Each structure stands twice: as C-alpha cells, then as structure tokens.
C-alpha cells in the first residue's frame, strides 16, 4: 500500500511539475506583453505637452491601441484542482509543497482581481475619455479590426496630449502596470 502511495505521489508531482512549467511559460509571455504595454504608456506620457508637430510625427493611434492592450493571465490548474477536490493532496508528503499548493488558488484569485480592476479602469475611465478625442476606427487598425480607410473625421491628438486629465489617465494605467508586475 505504501509503495502504491509513493508511486501515485510521483505521478502527481510529475503532473504538477508539467502543469506549473506550462503556467510559468504562459506567465513569462504575459509579463512580456504587460511590459510592452507599460513601455507604450510611458511613450505616451513622454508626448504630453509636446508641440503639434512632434505629436503629428508620432503614430499615436498605434500607441493608444497598445496602451489599451492588457494581457489576461488565466492559468489552468486542473491537476491541482483535481487534487484538492479528490482529497489526494494528502498523498504529497512534502509539507512545504502542500502549503505552497494551498496558497496557489488565493494567489491566482488576487491576480484575477487586479486584472478585473485594471479592465474596469480602462473601460470606465480611459475608454470613456478617449471616445471624445480619438477615432477608434483609426486605433483599431492596429488590432484585429482592419479598416480600409481611416475615419472621415479630422483627428488632432495634440489637444489630447495637452490635457492634465489625460496625463492622469496614463499615470493611472502605469500604476496598474506597476502593481501587476509586483504581484
């Protein structure tokens, strides 16, 4: 019976290892995407207060698009969930590992909560504000929607980059990026 338990523990640990390696790879990709978005927001911050020519010579539609692209981290934890639900977590004899596994779900919930807060900020504040000053038809050309022509409306982003309110929006985004990268 003990040998059977040891073999089952080895299988469980191997499955957990594979799952966590995949999560680690996914997490690194999300961190890279998050850092890219953070860098774009910093580029937008650097345009604040610049003259009309400097702003016009920058592809602000592209920067705005990428500043709004925030990666979601939603790892699968099927092996761990199965262990928790079946009670087989008791088969893991390493107490430190068991403690870490118990902390995993709350840690993921915290990350999801931060992501939801970032999305609410973007949707409720940033998008609402940008709707008044940018053409999302132009901005979306850098995402999954490719328009053949730009907006029929003349868009001048220099007004946007001379607004304290927009600076505060960008600073808010940087706050969330920084908070996310320290969790």
Residue ranges and their predicted role:
Residues 2-183:
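Long, hydrophobic alpha-helical segments that serve as membrane-spanning/inserting helices
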């Amino acid at each position: 019976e003990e040998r059977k338990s040891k073999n089952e523990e080895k299988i469980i640990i191997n499955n957990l290892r594979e799952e966590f390696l995949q999560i680690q790879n996914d997490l690194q990709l999300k961190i890279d995407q998050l850092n890219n978005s953070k860098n774009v927001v910093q580029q937008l911050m650097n345009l604040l207060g610049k003259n009309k020519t400097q702003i016009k010579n920058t592809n602000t539609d592209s920067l705005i698009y990428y500043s709004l692209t925030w990666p979601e981290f939603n790892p699968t934890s099927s092996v761990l969930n199965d262990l928790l639900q079946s009670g087989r977590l008791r088969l893991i004899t390493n107490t430190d590992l068991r403690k870490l596994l118990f902390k995993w779900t709350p840690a993921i919930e915290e990350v999801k909560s931060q992501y939801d807060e970032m999305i609410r900020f973007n949707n409720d504040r940033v998008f609402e504000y940008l709707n008044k000053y940018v053409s999302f038809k132009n901005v979306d050309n850098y995402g999954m929607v490719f328009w053949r022509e730009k907006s029929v409306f003349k868009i001048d982003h220099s007004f946007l980059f001379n607004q304290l309110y927009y600076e505060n929006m960008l600073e808010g985004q940087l706050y969330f990026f920084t908070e996310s990268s320290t969790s």
